[in-house]
């Protein structure tokens, strides 16, 4: 693939913050990334989801809550159903499902916060339907806290690498100035955290977001999934 800033930052954040590492190589204008095997989300929703058992649908709903939370926290945009895969894992007498992003070129670019929340894309409506059908509010809260806790632990593990990446990103022009201004205002409205208003770049926003997460990962009342 052709190298661009958003995609490289997106892959770096995926490698450090997601449950699974992602191997990749950048050489000048070329980018080689590890293939992520799985069923494209749009195909899964159309051909596989209707055939899943009720237990499997509940497990998929749980994974989707965590995936949605992960994308929102790390500002990975445009996660429509064709930009992620659903991975079936056979475990003795059952099949469990994991969800992973496969397209990272909308990392920290758009100015609308909703773009970083997969739940709002019409292509993902079927996933949101099973979340509403299968999970109670308390369960959604629990899974959001679990995901935030996991990301916080991964931040500690990758502390030095993350600091270096954010230092570079803060000095880089990843997006348009008006997108930064719009996004920081929207995030401020959700968090009431004044420090977001001081951000001058998408790198600043990512740094403030991750610091805010580590301080407040148990506070899920700010943003509702349903």
Regions found by a protein language model. Give the residues of each.
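Short C-terminal domain-edge/linker segments immediately following a structured domain
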Residues: 29-34, 63-64, 129-138
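Conserved kinase catalytic-core segment
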Residues: 51-113
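AlphaC helix of the protein kinase catalytic domain
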Residues: 43-50
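Short, low-complexity, polar/charged sequence segments that are solvent-exposed and flexible
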Residues: 17-21, 51-55, 118-123
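Hydrophobic, Leu/Ile/Phe/Ala-enriched alpha-helical segments that form helix-helix packing faces
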Residues: 17-18, 68-72, 187, 213, ...
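C-terminal catalytic region of ATP-dependent kinase domains
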Residues: 93-226
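Conserved ATP-binding subdomain of kinase catalytic cores across diverse folds
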Residues: 1-42
């Amino acid at each position: 693939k052709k190298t661009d800033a958003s995609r490289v930052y997106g892959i770096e954040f995926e490698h450090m913050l997601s449950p699974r590492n992602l191997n990749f190589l950048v050489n000048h204008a070329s980018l080689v990334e590890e293939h992520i095997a799985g069923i494209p989300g749009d195909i899964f929703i159309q051909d596989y989801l209707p055939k899943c058992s009720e237990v499997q649908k509940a497990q998929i709903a749980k994974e989707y809550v965590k995936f949605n939370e992960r994308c929102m926290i790390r500002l990975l945009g445009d996660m429509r159903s064709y930009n992620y895969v659903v991975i079936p894992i056979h475990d003795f007498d059952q099949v469990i499902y994991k969800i992973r992003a496969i397209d990272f070129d909308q990392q920290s670019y758009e100015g609308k916060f909703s773009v970083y929340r997969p739940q709002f894309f019409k292509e993902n409506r079927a996933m949101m339907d099973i979340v509403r059908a299968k999970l109670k509010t308390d369960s959604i809260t629990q899974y959001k806290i679990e995901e935030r806790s996991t990301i916080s632990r991964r931040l500690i593990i990758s502390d030095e690498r993350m600091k270096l990446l954010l230092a570079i990103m803060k000095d880089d022009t990843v997006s348009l100035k008006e997108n930064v201004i719009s996004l920081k205002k929207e995030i401020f409205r959700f968090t009431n955290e004044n420090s977001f208003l001081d951000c001058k770049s998408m790198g600043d926003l990512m740094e403030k977001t991750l610091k805010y997460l580590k301080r407040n990962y148990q506070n899920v009342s700010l943003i509702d999934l349903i």
